[in-house]
Amino acid sequence: MALFLASLSWSPSPLEKKYAQNPTDISRAQLPASFATAENIALIFHGRGGPDRETDDLKARFLAQDAAVGLDRAVEVYNWEEYLEGTDRVGYTGQALGRKFGKILAQNRALRSLHVVGTSAGSFISDATCSAYVAEAGDSRACVRLSLTDPITVRGGEELGDGWGLRNFGADCDFAEHYLNTDDIVPSTNIPLQRCHVYDVTGCAERASFPPP
């Protein structure tokens, strides 16, 4: 409901209207078959660079920690590189994919927990997956957690300091978190998200020894 109310005052940009007239074909996009019956799911969406060392490491961490506590969870990095278009379209395409995936996940009535992680341009697909799942699954839904790392918050045609994501990311989740650093050059990633718990890692000492991907 929070996301719905927030969106009432949002005026579609010219690029959003243009995208709606010629949306990206996502008809082939499907989730792993194991998600149809899994009781616990972790779904990771990469940024514009595609799957990399960081997404591989994140999946490995999920699996190792789950094994340590005996949690049976389906964990996957979803490769959506073929849908990564120009910066004026990628946010809208990400939301379209997320809406599709959320509805697919809602068909799994055994699902107990859903943890979605999005990096950079993967923010829109991640948030939309959570919101669509919550809307479709209703009262019997699973517990939903969203984790965003250095998320891009604007879609094509939006101002860098006033993007859709700043106002809405995480609105429909049981728990949403934003890992923020404020000193990089990527547009629209340096402002805390309004509806997420924010962890500002800008000054963390560990960054000095962290090799960029």
Where are these regions (language model features)?
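Bacterial Sec-dependent N-terminal signal peptides
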Residues: 8-20
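Short beta-strand-to-loop junctions in surface cap/lid or active-site-entrance loops
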Residues: 24-38
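Serine-dependent carboxylesterase/thioesterase catalytic core
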Residues: 10, 47-48, 52-53, 57, ...
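Generic structural motif
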Residues: 16, 22-28, 144
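Short glycine/proline-enriched loop/turn "hinge" motifs that connect secondary-structure elements
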Residues: 34-36, 67-70
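Hydrophobic membrane-insertion alpha-helices, especially the h-region
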Residues: 1-8
